[in-house]
């Protein structure tokens, strides 16, 4: 397996609007697209449960994106915020490997299943966060573009 450049940063925040304001006014990063993708995420099977409750803001840079995530209900993001506080949650790397290859390789390294695995209602994979927290200090987002 070979990972390339970082193409996505997922950051958990307590207050989405306040975080966006800091990025825009003090860091010069913007504009942001703010969304409340609740309906979309509620339909998913997320690590054996139903949906995710979040609000999100996206910045699309030159070859990378930053996602700010504000948890609005119980789930993995709220758990993260309570346990670790706001900050970097996950990274996504450019790769030519398939979704399954990356998931399998990360499981072989850690001995653990993904921290999160979101699937469409029909069971097809959408996204996973490989848990390499102990081994490499990070969660790796793995997107599935396979039909």
What are these regions (language model features)?
Residues 1-2, 147:
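Basic/polar N-terminal segments that are highly enriched at the extreme N-terminus
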Residues 77, 134-139:
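Short, charged/polar, Gly/Pro-enriched secondary-structure boundary elements
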Residues 37, 71-73:
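Histidine- and/or cysteine-centered catalytic micro-motif in compact active-site loops
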